[in-house]
């Protein structure tokens, strides 16, 4: 079976520059990625073709050889072949973007490295009188707040016990899965990106290391505020 033209595979013209190639690859990789198309052999095959086409066309030397000789330039090991995986520098940035969008921005990776997690956004709807909107006021509101558990001091483990390194990911929070001739890094399914497992969870926070409590906040409502106005607190 004849191989598809690399330019046609990516849906770009032969005059496409590096930026156009990268944009086309990223769009198609997102569409046909195995994680978005589980058990779909056609999508997996298409993803491999997209990967191979970009691997060749992003390299100026390989692209020049392909433009001159077509697929024959890579037969019998010429120019290093077409299955070299992610040796080029362009893939790391692109796949980091792709996995970021697919996996919610890499929060699990941040947890496994010990970084502080960003709290969830909260929205509070407040009703005030017409008089208050003219004169302004200071209002007290109560909002749920995530704080460190005072029983386990944030470890998530029952007092007197300790978390253990995850045996699946060896404490990294990430695992690699083979997909044909390339591999994909994913959040560890055992520890969910933490890098640790908790055999004996804390009875108060149930292994989360944090608990939710309400706290009071003062909100200054400025004079002349209009209906639908948003006030942001950080």
Curated annotation (Swiss-Prot):
Keywords: Chaperone, Cytoplasm, DNA replication, Metal-binding, Repeat, Stress response, Zinc, Zinc-finger. Its cofactor is Zn(2+). It comes from the Bacteria. Its main location: cytoplasm. CDD domains: DnaJ, DnaJ_zf. Zn(2+) 1 binds at residues 149, 152, 202, 205. Participates actively in the response to hyperosmotic and heat shock by preventing the aggregation of stress-denatured proteins and by disaggregating proteins, also in an autonomous, DnaK-independent fashion. Unfolded proteins bind initially to DnaJ; upon interaction with the DnaJ-bound protein, DnaK hydrolyzes its bound ATP, resulting in the formation of a stable complex. GrpE releases ADP from DnaK; ATP binding to DnaK triggers the release of the substrate protein, thus completing the reaction cycle. Belongs to the DnaJ family. This is Chaperone protein DnaJ. It comes from Rhizobium leguminosarum. The gene is dnaJ.
């Amino acid at each position: 079976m004849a191989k598809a033209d690399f330019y046609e595979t990516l849906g770009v013209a032969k005059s496409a520059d590096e930026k156009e190639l990268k944009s086309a690859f990223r769009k198609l990789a997102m569409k046909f990625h195995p994680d978005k198309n589980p058990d779909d052999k056609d999508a997996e095959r298409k993803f491999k073709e997209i990967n191979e086409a970009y691997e060749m066309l992003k390299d100026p030397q390989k692209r020049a050889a392909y433009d001159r000789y077509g697929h024959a330039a890579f037969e019998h090991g010429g120019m290093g072949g077409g299955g070299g995986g992610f040796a080029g520098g362009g893939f790391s940035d692109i796949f980091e973007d792709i996995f970021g969008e697919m996996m919610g921005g890499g929060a699990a990776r941040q947890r496994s490295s010990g970084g502080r997690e960003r709290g969830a956004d909260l929205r509070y709807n407040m009703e005030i009188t017409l008089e208050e909107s003219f004169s302004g006021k200071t209002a007290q509101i109560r909002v749920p707040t995530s704080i460190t558990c005072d029983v386990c001091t944030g470890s998530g483990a029952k007092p007197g016990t300790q978390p253990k390194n995850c045996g699946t990911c060896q404490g990294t929070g990430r695992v690699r899965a083979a997909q044909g001739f390339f591999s994909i890094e994913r959040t560890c399914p055992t520890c969910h990106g933490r890098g640790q497992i908790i055999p004996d969870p804390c009875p108060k926070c149930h292994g989360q290391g944090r608990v939710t409590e309400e706290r009071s906040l003062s909100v200054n409502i400025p004079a002349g505020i209009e209906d639908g106005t948003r006030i942001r607190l950080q």
